[in-house]
Design a protein with these regions (language model features):
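Active-site environment of divalent metal-dependent phosphoester hydrolases
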Residues: 60
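Conserved phosphate/oxyanion-binding catalytic-loop motifs
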Residues: 57
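Asp-based, Mg2+/Mn2+-dependent phosphohydrolase catalytic module
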Residues: 1-46, 63-79, 89-270
């Protein structure tokens, strides 16, 4: 089956955010939609094709992204955005973790954990943590490293939202902090953080459950060969690389999601 055949037969779509549907600024400012983003989400919604928007960012909650993307004219269902915290919650819950030291933001990580019935803990109030979750944390400091060391040394499991080095923005690549923080914690504990965001199998499983679609029948669209295309490879899904001139071995390579719209418009029916 060709890539085009698999695209036509796909039962669900996973759409990246930064560099795929929109571009933000390095300071986290307003998003600008990329060509085809509004049309792609509208097309999938109109045809009843299940899809989720999956960002590897953990600074903001899924609800924030729903509102922000809708404000740009994109069609996004109420529960249509996933972040690494979404898959983290699945993992933490399945493994019986309840008290989670958060190295990240209260809005992006703390609030979703609370909504899921878990208890987020922060530096200075972290006694009894049974897990540590690393996310975007630009104010990370020695007190946080001490807290992580205490928790992991006492037996807490260590997880990270992302291993991405950079995030695409309209004003240039922005450093992803999760990877650096995980490296610092490893340096003092000897423990490697387990990845729960893209491209991990945990992320694949969360998407498949949310959409009710087998992973191998998904189309995963993004601009990062190390994230979306690798995620597609692990899932056995169709990987569509957009806006990237690298040498990644993607199933389809397109200039942007507007080209994907052009391919889907005459052909895709559920």
């Amino acid at each position: 089956m060709t890539a085009q055949d698999r695209l036509r037969a796909a039962r669900g779509f996973v759409l990246d955010v930064d560099g795929t549907l929109v571009l933000g600024t390095r300071d986290g400012g307003d998003f600008t939609p990329l060509p085809g983003a509004v049309e792609l989400t509208g097309l999938l919604a109109d045809r009843g094709v299940p899809y989720v928007v999956f960002t590897n960012g953990s600074a903001k909650s899924p609800g924030y992204y729903v509102d922000a993307l809708r404000a740009l004219g994109l069609t996004v269902p109420d529960e249509g955005v996933l972040t690494p915290v979404s898959s983290a919650i699945d993992v933490l819950t399945a493994r019986g973790h309840r008290r989670v030291l958060v190295l990240g933001t209260r809005d992006g990580i703390g609030a979703p954990l609370t909504d899921a019935g878990l208890r987020p803990l922060f530096t200075g109030e972290h006694a009894g943590a049974d897990a540590v979750l690393i996310g975007l944390h630009r104010q990370f400091g020695m007190a946080d490293l001490d807290a992580a060391y205490d928790a992991v040394s006492a037996g807490a499991a260590l997880y990270t939202c992302s291993e991405a080095r950079f995030v695409a923005t309209a004003t240039g690549d922005k450093l992803g902090t999760s990877r650096a923080i995980a490296g610092a914690v490893h340096a003092v504990t000897g423990v490697h953080a387990e990845l729960v965001g893209k491209p991990s199998r945990h992320a694949v499983d969360t998407v498949a459950r949310r959409l009710g679609v087998p992973a191998h029948e998904l189309v995963i669209v993004g601009d990062d060969p190390e994230l979306e295309i690798e995620m597609a490879r692990r899932a056995g899904a169709l990987g569509v690389l957009v806006g990237n001139d690298g040498s990644a071995d993607a199933d389809l390579r397109l200039d942007g999601v507007d080209a994907l719209v052009a391919m889907l418009e005459p052909t895709h029916r559920r």
